[in-house]
Amino acid sequence: MLTFEMIIVFLGLIGMVTALVLDKMRPGMILFSVTVLFLCFGILTPKEMLEGFSNKGMITVALLFLISVGVRQSGALGQLIKKLLPQEKTTVMKAQARMLPAISFVSAFLNNTPVVVIFAPIIKRWAESVRIPATKFLIPLSYATILGGMCTLIGTSTNLVVDGMILDAGYKGFGMFELGRVGIFIALAGIVYLLFFSSRLLPEVRKDTVGDEHGEADASSFHRVEAVIGARFPGINKRVGDFNFVRHYGAEVKEIKRSGVSIVDNLSRVKFREGDTLVLWADDSFISTWGDSSVFVLLANGKDTEPKAGRKKRWFALTLLVLMIVGATVGELPFMEELLPGIDLDMFFFAAVTTVIMAWTKLFPARKYTKYISWDILITIACAFAISRAMVNSGVADIIAHGIIDMSDDYSPHVLLAVLFIITNLFTELITNNAAAALAFPLALSLSNQLGVSPMPFFVVICIAASASFSTPIGYQTNLIVQGIGNYKFTDFVRIGLPLNILTFIISVILIPLIWPF
């Protein structure tokens, strides 16, 4: 029988999912609203509501944002992709064979978003120069970063979120490369799939419908600029007519590209959305100010906005990154606890040290560090911990887990593992990966407890399924970015992404129980 608290939690979860699907607000505010609802009804205590804001996993994500910026500002990423891109005439498969493995490797250790933000404009300009459709490379770029992120603890924020929940539940967390035991097989299979099928399944280039016909392209200080709306753009969900773009940014919106459609007429009534490509009429100051920010990703502007730094700075940034990874890996070894008692040499420790060194050596502008952190993602993560706790406190997690078991003809853990993968993956395609993990984690705990088996296979499945956002552009931020840059339609993601989702599912449900037995 449902209690009053269960009804409130169910209504809160239904409202949360609905608001996320309809994009009513930013995800962080939606999840925060739900946690406040649970607080008001006594389902969460103030301490339980705020625990996520001090969780190591959440703070580590914030530190990795800054570390990614430090590596990006050094110019190392731009130099890497330029060396990988063939300058002579080539084929799509040959170019992808050079790019995708390296991109996956990089994204295993850096936040996926800055990797895509740096690589996508460079790849687009290169594709135009060698006369190959850029649309053949941009979705594979996003997918390669997602696949790489599955291979390490720090590869994606979802892995750190689940790891934080595991530690809070009293279990041993993931090692740095533990997820790679299954992630590397998925990444290799995914890259092979992209090499053989992406050229056939992805569209040819879609030409722009608006360009120099405005008669303004001859001005010396103004340029036709294409800018993809990022997560920190303040006008998301506001109408163009209500948001004074000229006053905010000194540029005029001429066109909006969305899901393969160019919007020119009645622009004032159109609402801005994350991932939209804006065709702007802007001057040099706009390019210099917003060329390196999380507000926009600048594309066709006639100027190179890639960060530039000396060779020594590039090598120093990469050395710090390698030392952080090695330190966190060695810190997991048993003898380190005896060598340095009282010091927890985990990923958080080394990320914090690396961030401080990067700040004081000016690898990123320390005075402006707040603009490089995606606060909405952090609030989403922090509130995800509270929502997961509310599902456990109210008994909702047990009710849902019991229902899943009852609906399954076979009570085998293998079958229920597959069911959990499908549920988590559907949520991540419709809402966000971190919110999906928040909903799935208490289910994993309840399922394992009711079956009397190890929860670790279920935890790993959540990490993989919540990251495997291939079939829609809305489940993962990098998909939204390349959708705007490549002018893709929603169906483009379904056509190439759905088989990759199925491939990931098959590999996961076969290998995970073998590597992490029940």
Task: Please place each PLM-identified region on the residue numbering.
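Hydrophobic transmembrane alpha-helices of multi-pass small-molecule transporters
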Residues: M1-A62, L66, F196, R200, ...
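Loop-to-transmembrane alpha-helix initiation sites
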Residues: I7-I8, M49-I59, M176-L188, M456-P457
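Interfacial segments of multi-pass membrane proteins
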Residues: L37-G42, M165-Y171, I357-M358, L447, ...
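Generic detector of multi-pass transmembrane helix bundles and their immediately adjacent loops
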Residues: A401-H402, D406-N487, T491, R495-T504, ...
